[in-house]
Amino acid sequence: MKEAAVERHFVWAVERAGGKTWKFKSPSNRGVCDRIACLPDGSTWFVELKTKGGRLSELQKLHAADLVALNQNYACLWTTEQVDQWLLTTTR
């Protein structure tokens, strides 16, 4: 499955759960997360989407560590099943 298919499923699943998601692009900062998701419970998530077997670049790992250090919600999801499981656990 391609990363675009995982991303489409992510958008669909978040919207179906009543949330909103936006593509996150920062022209001057490479390696930022793919999506920002705002969920109905008021939480905001920075989400990186990959294909199964995909790897985070060193820059993506650095950005992820920065977000976690700032006490932000961060997730890296590799499959549509992981997207569904993540959504189940974050919207309880």
Please describe what each predicted stretch is.
Residues 1-92:
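Catalytic phosphate/metal-binding cores of nucleic-acid and nucleotide-processing enzymes, i.e., regions
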